């Protein structure tokens, strides 16, 4: 008695969390307008990459500087998408700094 429910899973990644949240809201709003059920955006753990370099060129090993790069992630599930939903999502214009992975 299992239904054949279709699901679109969208993972968003970005360094800027404000652009990421705006993109997620655009996707959710577009999917809801076209008649699909939306679950999310779910915030996934932020990935933090720390890079340590020496400030001096030759010696002074104790003098170091650290830089970090944070990758923010969100997950959106679109349940029972209609062809209108898929078409609307394809035409959606999102910022350049946001990486999108779509799985059907």
UniProtKB/Swiss-Prot annotation:
Any single GO CC term annotated in Swiss-Prot or TrEMBL for this entry? ribonucleoprotein complex
Q: Which UniProt keywords apply?
A: Ribonucleoprotein, Ribosomal protein
Q: Is Ribosomal protein there in the keyword field?
A: yes
Extract the InterPro entries matched here. Answer: Ribosomal_uS10, Ribosomal_uS10_CS, Ribosomal_uS10_dom, Ribosomal_uS10_dom_sf
SMART domains, per database record: Ribosomal_S10 (SM01403)
Q: What does this protein do?
A: Involved in the binding of tRNA to the ribosomes.
Q: What is this protein called?
A: Small ribosomal subunit protein uS10
